[in-house]
């Protein structure tokens, strides 16, 4: 079979055809597609014939005869008709510029010959959970790659320093999360870590050369076995908007250099082994919408600088070892929809303005299982329609008014009348710690 393929493919450099590929509906948007004609300032090695040979090797190495869709592979049809293959003119010559083979039952190891696809801009092999072995070093020689998606494969080994060669990368998805977390999540950190540990494939330290991916806007490394400190060079990713390292084993703390990422909108670092205090520089992330650092071992106080994150919608710091008082500055976050500070060691009183008139979008405030003292602020109010839309999209419980979850603290005094008018809220106020409680309402 391989010999006949090679014979057929020698004709394809002449009769290639240039068109968009046939791709499955499961593939992600083509963020890295090239236009029909792209002029390059640097010389480009290879040809359509070398691309053809590389595709043959890919087909054989990844069990092509058993793919879910292998239309026109192993045929004399132009490469542009092969399922998932996109051929585009590059500097006037037809070349393979994209492979869309996600969720296609690929099995085996990625061959080193993939490095011969020197014009490749998009490589999507995600959701092929029987792709195994390490990521070949040659893949990182594809310096024109714009989109690399290897999500939920069974790749192993460490990321090499050569990852820094992908200087054109916009989307890097190496995550290993195919599961609906709600199926096994019960709020217990031990259970969460046990399930996390069963998902690991990639390992080792994150190379500091990742900081050379200065055009990257989306990086997802979640649920991999990465360890050690996060490299300070992450602060060089000036175009980054989305960063997830959720469910890894990183230690140390979030680098202060992350505060330089002015375009960052989403930062997820939950379920790691982070312990150092949160850096005040996080308050410089002026476009941040979600800050998720739950289920770590972070000590120290919540930085007051987080009150400068005016676009923040979701703040989740639950299940850490945070201490000190809740910064009053958090009451100035007018766009906040939900905040989770539960299961820490926070003390002092709930800030008087927390959940006040400025925070009309606030749906959910979880402060349970801390060491908070004093009385409950009278802050029950109707939420705005925009908040209800957000709740529906995010799957957040919504009652049409702000919910405070305050059980497991040291609160005293009387329950404000505003709470008594909304009986559904009362179950979230009790019980308090032994020896504490309220003079009215449920016990």
Where in this protein do the model-derived segments appear?
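Bacterial Sec-dependent N-terminal signal peptides
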Residues: 15-50
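Leucine-rich solenoid repeat scaffolds
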Residues: 361-365, 373-443
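LRR flanking "cap" motifs
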Residues: 60-109, 178-205, 440
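Intrinsically disordered, low-complexity Ser/Thr- and acidic-rich flexible linkers and loops
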Residues: 176-203, 356-361, 382-401
